Curated annotation (Swiss-Prot):
Keywords: Bacterial flagellum, Glycoprotein, Phosphoprotein, Secreted. Phosphorylated on tyrosine residue(s). Flagellin from strain 5939 but not from strain 170018 is glycosylated. Disulfide bonds: none annotated. This is A-type flagellin. Pfam families: Flagellin_C, Flagellin_N. Belongs to the bacterial flagellin family. Gene3D superfamilies: 2.60.40.4390, 6.10.280.190, f41 fragment of flagellin, N-terminal domain (1.20.1330.10), Flagellar export chaperone, C-terminal domain (6.10.10.10). It comes from Pseudomonas aeruginosa. PANTHER family: FLAGELLIN. Signal peptide: none annotated.
Length: 394
């Protein structure tokens, strides 16, 4: 190698190596101080792109978890209100059964009905005031809401809540489309009544009548006999008129027939021309009737019996809605568990890409520190090489 003064190759080479070790030392210091292996795109362009995508997914999963928790809270709010509505309906049912009892006077039934009216208002109040985040849940305006429970678009769970006011809660039962009149007994005898509905059992009911009974007494006896038959039909006497109500779910095409047969004259013991109480057919068919909880009136025994049927159906409606809300809460719970699992694994993958390996980076730091110190010492010696030319000039 030529001995020159203007160009010090050894010094230039040492400077280059010293710059490289200094740059590596700065990189190690930055990685150790930030905890991140990728601090700019130049550190790992492809890794930066992948890590950013994974970061977006992790952030989305965290938001989705919060959204799912909001969904659980909303469902719990609605379900709690429906529990109270169920309690109210159970109380109304108790009052209806109490009113249906024959020991109650008209004034007692009126008092019982007064409490029912207050409970109807409370049902409406719960429906109108149950809110979550300012949004009403049970007044019918909620409809169906979608909860974003994923890190990508359109990963949703839909929750629907129906109206649960007293007016919307309804029950179906079958009411005879007409009433039958009963005439007073003119002779003692037996009234034979064939009663039943389609899809249910049918029985013959025999009612013994006395010759001196009024039409009202005869009607009460016939109604009691029908009720005792327990074939799913309720009979109610009002004066000399009998009306019928069938339980919800029974076929409305059924018919009731009431006819006098085999009348026996009490004083002769033989069949004759005298008649016991005359009964005209109460109904030839049932008409399907839909009543709401808001229309319940238990001021009469007949109304109380119908109220029980309506309330039973209303409780079924609420139970169905509560079951849906319970199911969606379980779904949200499972979704949250899955989101947490995904988030954990995605975070681990991102960490492997962008996090600093402190063991390896500390080793790099030590190496670069030694190289920098050595390079500085060697550079000092390299810079002294041109001075050797002076010995040739002496």
């Amino acid at each position: 190698m030529a001995l020159t003064v203007n160009t010090n190759i050894a010094s230039l080479n040492t400077q280059r190596n010293l710059n490289n070790s200094s740059a590596s030392l700065n990189t190690s210091l930055q990685r150790l101080s930030t905890g991140s292996r990728i601090n700019s795109a130049k550190d790992d362009a492809a890794g930066l792109q992948i890590a950013n995508r994974l970061t977006s997914q992790v952030n989305g999963l965290n938001v989705a978890t919060k959204n799912a928790n909001d969904g659980i809270s909303l469902a719990q709010t609605a379900e709690g209100a429906l529990q109270q509505s169920t309690n109210i309906l159970q109380r109304m049912r108790d009052l209806s059964l109490q009113s249906a009892n024959g020991s109650n006077s008209d004034s007692e039934r009126t008092a019982l009905n007064g409490e029912v009216k207050q409970l109807q208002k409370e049902l409406d109040r719960i429906s109108n005031t149950t809110t979550f985040g300012g949004r009403k849940l049970l007044d019918g305006s909620f409809g169906v809401a979608s909860f974003q429970v994923g890190s990508a678009a359109n990963e949703i769970i839909s929750v629907g809540i129906d109206e649960m006011s007293a007016e919307s809660l309804n029950g179906t039962y079958f009411k005879a489309d007409g009433g039958g009149a009963v005439t007073a007994a003119t002779a003692s005898g037996t009234v034979d009544i064939a009663i039943g509905i389609t899809g249910g059992s049918a029985v013959n009911v025999k009612v013994d009548m006395k010759g001196n009974e009024t039409a009202e007494q005869a009607a009460a006896k016939i109604a009691a006999a029908v009720n005792d038959a327990n074939v799913g039909i309720g009979a109610f006497s009002d004066g000399d008129t009998i009306s019928y109500v069938s339980k919800a779910g029974k076929d409305g095409s059924g018919a009731i027939t009431s006819a006098v047969s085999g009348v026996v004259i009490a004083d002769t013991g033989s069949t004759g021309v005298g008649t016991a109480a005359g009964v005209t057919p109460s109904a030839t068919a049932f008409a399907k009737t839909n009543d709401t909880v808001a229309k319940i009136d238990i001021s009469t025994a007949k109304g109380a019996q119908s109220a029980v049927l309506v309330i039973d159906e209303a409780i079924k409606q609420i139970d169905a809605q509560r079951a849906d809300l319970g199911a969606v809460q379980n779904r949200f719970d499972n979704t949250i568990n899955n989101l947490k699992n995904i988030g954990e694994n995605v975070s681990a993958a991102r960490g492997r890409i962008e996090d600093t390996d402190f063991a390896a980076e500390t080793a790099n730091l030590t190496k670069n520190q030694v190289l920098q110190q050595a390079g500085t010492a060697i550079l000092a010696q390299a810079n002294q090489l041109p001075q050797s030319v002076l010995s040739l000039l002496r």
